[in-house]
């Protein structure tokens, strides 16, 4: 559970319902548990992939099963993919929208993690799927976006350079990279503590 999703849902008047992710299965979502929690009041499924805080990267099969649930129950998909470039050990990120072309999917991303500029508060939303069925929703998103002030001008220039330039995150997650070494050390030290288990983040 990433607390911002819980808080945002509650702030909007909704009731967040958490589904299980199983440590013994590499923190993959428990699809039976997820389906058991879907009710007529359920509006969407939030998928944080790569996951925060577990570090799990969901398989295409797992994502396909989540999409099948969303399709069966006519649910919106909310894909938090802010960690999509921070991958270790040949892990592969599969964008949720690519598995659900027939469903409305909102994908959230930004600069804060992969480009290490959290203070810029620069991000984006991509809406895919049958948008013709969500025109009023999309208009509402547009109104909300227009009510917000834009990032500062240097940050806007940084977005263009970051997305179009050298992807330096690769140097940090490959062998010898600082993020990979920190991940490995933290994982090793946690597992050395008696009674503590830790799945290696992907």
Please state what every model-predicted region is.
Residues 12, 72-73, 103:
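Helix C-cap/helix->beta junction micro-motif
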Residues 17, 22-92:
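Active-site phosphate-binding strand-loop segment of PLP-dependent enzymes
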């Amino acid at each position: 559970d990433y607390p911002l999703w819980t808080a945002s849902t509650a702030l909007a008047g909704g009731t967040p319902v958490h589904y299980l992710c199983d440590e013994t299965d590499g923190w993959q979502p428990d699809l039976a548990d997820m389906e058991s929690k879907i009710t007529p009041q359920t509006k969407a499924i939030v998928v944080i992939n790569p996951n925060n805080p577990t570090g799990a990267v969901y398989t295409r099969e797992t994502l396909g099963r989540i999409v099948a649930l969303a399709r069966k129950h006519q649910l919106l998909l909310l894909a938090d993919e802010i960690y999509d470039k921070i991958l270790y050990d040949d892990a592969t990120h599969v964008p949720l929208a690519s598995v659900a072309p027939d469903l409305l999917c909102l994908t959230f991303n930004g600069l804060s993690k992969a480009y290490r500029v959290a203070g810029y508060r620069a991000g984006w939303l991509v809406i895919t799927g049958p948008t013709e069925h969500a025109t009023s929703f999309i208009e509402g998103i547009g109104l909300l976006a227009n009510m917000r002030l834009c990032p500062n001008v240097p940050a806007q220039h940084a977005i263009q350079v970051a997305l179009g330039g050298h992807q330096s995150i690769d140097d940090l997650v490959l062998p010898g990279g600082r993020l990979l070494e920190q991940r490995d050390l933290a994982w090793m030290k946690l597992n050395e503590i008696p009674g503590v288990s830790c799945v290696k983040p992907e």
